[in-house]
């Protein structure tokens, strides 16, 4: 939180308008499979137990982080561009990610770029 607040302050100090992005969603199963690739069954099970028995815990943590971005933006009076919805509105949003289930691929980055370009007239 403090890192975001510091960055926002720095951007304003330079006379610029800070803008934040929400996070793209995460494909929890793809991410779990990616980080556990090469693990034996016992190690995979250990990771799953650490997650409380559900791979969905990964997505829940990710969404909590995303919600904190919305809170920071609101408290700091910063415009936040919602890219989360751009992904979730696609039935096949998982196809917009690399094999790790977290980082957008080229098509996912294009979706982010389009969302930013569409929002910019309201920012400047």
Q: Can you annotate each of these PLM segments?
A:
Residues 1-124:
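Alpha-helical cap/lid subdomain in secreted, periplasmic
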């Amino acid at each position: 939180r403090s890192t975001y607040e510091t960055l926002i302050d720095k951007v304003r100090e330079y006379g610029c308008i800070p803008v934040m992005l929400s996070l793209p969603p995460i494909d929890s199963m793809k991410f779990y499979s990616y980080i556990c690739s090469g693990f034996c069954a016992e190690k995979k099970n250990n990771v799953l137990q650490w997650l409380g028995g559900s791979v969905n815990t990964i997505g829940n943590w990710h969404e909590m982080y995303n919600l904190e971005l919305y809170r920071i933006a609101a408290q700091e009076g910063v415009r936040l561009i919602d890219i989360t919805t751009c992904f979730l509105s696609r039935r096949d949003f998982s196809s917009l990610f690399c094999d790790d289930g977290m980082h957008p691929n080229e098509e996912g980055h294009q979706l982010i770029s389009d969302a930013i370009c569409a929002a910019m007239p309201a920012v400047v």
